[in-house]
């Protein structure tokens, strides 16, 4: 079983496309900037997994700029 599950993540960000986009951008930032992350510990060793864990924890949210 993967953690966090896609069902739990979709409760935080309602679109699969948006979820993937946010996680990918955060993972890329963590990789390029050698960012250790905002959580004290992670289950995943990979950047995308860490980004998904941050979304699940509510530390990473999608900002909607619709006008």
UniProtKB/Swiss-Prot annotation:
One of its GO terms (cellular component) is DNA-directed RNA polymerase complex. Keywords: DNA-directed RNA polymerase, Nucleotidyltransferase, Transcription, Transferase. It is an enzyme of class 2 (transferase). It catalyses: RNA(n) + a ribonucleoside 5'-triphosphate = RNA(n+1) + diphosphate. InterPro entries: DNA-dir_RNA_pol_omega, Pol_omega/Rpo6/RPB6, RPB6/omega-like_sf. HAMAP family: RNApol_bact_RpoZ (MF_00366). NCBIfam families: rpoZ (TIGR00690). This is DNA-directed RNA polymerase subunit omega. It comes from Listeria welshimeri serovar 6b (strain ATCC 35897 / DSM 20650 / CCUG 15529 / CIP 8149 / NCTC 11857 / SLCC 5334 / V8). The gene is rpoZ.
């Amino acid at each position: 079983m993967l953690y966090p599950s896609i069902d739990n993540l979709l409760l935080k960000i309602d679109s699969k496309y948006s979820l993937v986009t946010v996680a990918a951008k955060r993972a890329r930032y963590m990789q390029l900037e050698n960012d250790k992350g905002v959580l004290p510990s992670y289950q995943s060793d990979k950047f995308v997994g860490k980004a998904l864990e941050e979304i699940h924890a509510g530390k990473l949210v999608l900002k909607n700029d619709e006008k």
